[in-house]
Swiss-Prot record:
SUPFAM superfamilies: Ribosomal protein L20
UniProt key word RNA-binding: yes
A cellular component term, taken from the record's GO annotations: ribonucleoprotein complex
Family statement drawn from the similarity comment of this UniProt entry: Belongs to the bacterial ribosomal protein bL20 family.
Coiled-coil region: none
Name by which UniProt lists this protein: Large ribosomal subunit protein bL20c
Keywords recorded for this protein, A-Z: Chloroplast, Plastid, Ribonucleoprotein, Ribosomal protein, RNA-binding, rRNA-binding
Leader peptide range in chain numbering: none
Organism: Nandina domestica
CDD domains (UniProt xref): Ribosomal_L20
Taxonomic classification: Eukaryota, Viridiplantae, Streptophyta, Embryophyta, Tracheophyta
Keyword set includes Glycoprotein: no
Length: 119
């Protein structure tokens, strides 16, 4: 009986997986079983951390806005300013407000004065 050579499909699948794991260290980039396990773990971590990143950035924006607003007025806080912002129907989200707080504090000061005046 003559020997039949295997096809290239399994080898192509393994090389594709190895390309994904080429930046991993040690056996995680060389051995097929550990590559597959690490790939599953990496994809799960990236999926989980995308949501975590959104939460972390929102916390950072809120902290920056709160710090900048407390410099303006002692009795004025983040929660009051956001409430007044919604009352005055200004369409500024937390990301934009945080950027304004870092780059141009005078502009944030003027916005907060307008909000307080609208109350």
């Amino acid at each position: 009986m003559t020997r039949i050579r295997r096809g290239y499909i399994a080898r192509r699948r393994r090389t594709k997986i190895r390309l994904f794991a080429s930046t991993f260290r040690g056996a995680h980039s060389r051995l097929t079983r550990t590559i597959i396990q690490q790939k599953m773990r990496a994809l799960a971590s990236s999926h989980r951390d995308r949501g975590r990143q959104k939460r972390n950035f929102r916390r950072l924006w809120i902290t920056r806005i709160n710090a900048a607003i407390r410099e303006i007025g002692v009795s004025y806080s983040y929660s009051r300013s956001i409430k007044d912002l919604y009352k005055s129907q200004l369409l500024l989200n937390r990301k934009i407000l945080a950027q304004i707080a870092i780059s141009n504090t005078n502009c944030l000061y003027m916005i907060s004065k307008e909000i307080i005046k609208f109350k």
